[in-house]
């Protein structure tokens, strides 16, 4: 069977060729040859294009992936860097705001400092003019032979022979000092009402303390000129003289006046104030006892002079009395030193605002004493 099938297939193939079944194809073979090359070229070009496109696609995909990876990495890094940069911007804004506020504060402080300097220069100029006027008045008083007494209490004219130029100068300086004191107290009152800062308030407190120091310096010069005038208190009003102690106020009295206006105090402040008050009272007692002994010694020296009045030689008792009178000047200076030390120690114990309130209370206290004296002098009197 196999041989038959193979023979039959062979027979069929031969018979088909013999029958001319492939002749048309053989006729087209002449046309097939030119198109075949074109077809082959087209096919090869298509294959080349497909292979190249495939290659491009294969090459392009990794490049795109790399670009995407780079883009994602850059975006991620930018996102990571965005938060610190925003925080840095906020920090820089806060720093810039602080610097702007600080510069504004510095400009405001400089402006206030210029205003204070301008006011201080103006005050110095006014003081210079007032001092010049006082000097001219003093010269005229000397030429006219008149002695000018304190205008705030009583005024009287005395003979030229009894006039002490040092005391006349002190009276005029003290009148000017009172005007300045009223102005400084008014400034402290205004500052406390305006609630200004502690730095500016401390400047006012120090200025007021220095003003009291000037008063003590003036009194020391007046004591050299006439210590009895200073001790008598003729340069003060009658109400002030009622409370006078060795040419001025008692330091313990100062503390009693100031204390209600500086409260509340801390425990440490209370302890220090009590110690200051105790030491001031002890110093007052020591000075008072020393003054009593001085008066007693003066009385004894004068009594000795009475016994030897008929004696020709009485120079020794008089010399002893003069020494006692010279010691009186030292007592006045020591009392003023105690007053000044009490003021300074009190200001150190208190805060700046408490010290300002204390100086305001002290200034108002003396101002009301002077006003009370004026009211007393102007009271209606019954005619008898």
UniProtKB/Swiss-Prot annotation:
List where Polar residues composition bias occurs. Answer: 76-88
Q: Where do we find the motif Nuclear localization signal here? A: 99-106
Q: Where in the cell is it found?
A: Nucleus
Query: InterPro entries from the entry?
Result: bZIP, bZIP_sf, TGA_domain
Query: What GO biological process term is on the record, naming one?
Result: defense response to bacterium
Q: Where is the composition biased (Low complexity)?
A: 39-55
Q: In which tissues is it expressed?
A: Expressed in the whole plant.
Q: Which family does it belong to?
A: Belongs to the bZIP family.
Q: What is this protein called?
A: Transcription factor TGA3
- Supply the source organism for this entry: Arabidopsis thaliana
């Amino acid at each position: 069977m196999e041989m038959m099938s193979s023979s039959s297939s062979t027979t069929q193939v031969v018979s088909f060729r013999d029958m001319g079944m492939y002749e048309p194809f053989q006729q087209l073979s002449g046309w097939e040859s030119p198109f075949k090359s074109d077809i082959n070229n087209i096919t090869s070009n298509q294959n080349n294009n497909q292979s190249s496109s495939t290659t491009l696609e294969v090459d392009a995909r990794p490049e795109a992936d790399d670009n995407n990876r780079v883009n994602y990495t850059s975006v991620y890094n930018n996102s990571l860097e965005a938060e610190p940069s925003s925080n840095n911007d906020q920090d820089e804004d806060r720093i810039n705001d602080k610097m702007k506020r600080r510069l504004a504060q510095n400009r405001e402080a400089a402006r206030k400092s210029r205003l204070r300097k301008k006011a201080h220069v103006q005050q110095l100029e006014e003081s210079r003019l007032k001092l010049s006027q006082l000097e001219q008045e003093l010269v005229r008083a000397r030429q006219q032979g008149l002695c000018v007494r304190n205008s705030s209490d009583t005024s009287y004219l005395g003979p030229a022979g009894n006039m002490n130029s040092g005391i006349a100068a002190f009276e005029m300086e003290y009148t000017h000092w009172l005007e300045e004191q009223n102005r400084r107290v008014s400034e402290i009152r205004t500052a406390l009402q305006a609630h200004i800062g502690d730095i500016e308030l401390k400047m006012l407190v120090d200025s007021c303390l220095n003003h009291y120091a000037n008063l003590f310096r003036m009194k020391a010069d007046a004591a050299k000129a006439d210590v009895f005038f200073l001790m008598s208190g003729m340069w003060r009003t009658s109400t002030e003289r009622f409370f006078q102690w060795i040419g001025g106020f008692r330091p313990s009295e100062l503390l009693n006046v100031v204390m209600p206006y500086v409260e509340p105090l801390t425990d440490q402040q209370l302890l220090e104030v009590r110690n200051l008050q105790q030491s001031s009272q002890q110093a007052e007692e020591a000075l008072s006892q020393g003054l009593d002994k001085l008066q007693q010694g003066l009385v004894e020296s004068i009594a000795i002079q009475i016994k030897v009045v008929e004696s020709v030689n009485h120079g020794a008792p008089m010399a002893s009395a003069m020494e006692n009178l010279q010691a009186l000047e030292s007592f006045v200076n020591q009392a003023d030193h105690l007053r000044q030390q009490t003021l300074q120690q009190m200001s150190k114990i208190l805060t700046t605002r408490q010290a300002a309130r204390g100086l305001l209370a002290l200034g108002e206290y003396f101002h009301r004493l002077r006003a009370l004296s004026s009211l007393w002098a102007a009271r209606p009197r019954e005619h008898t």
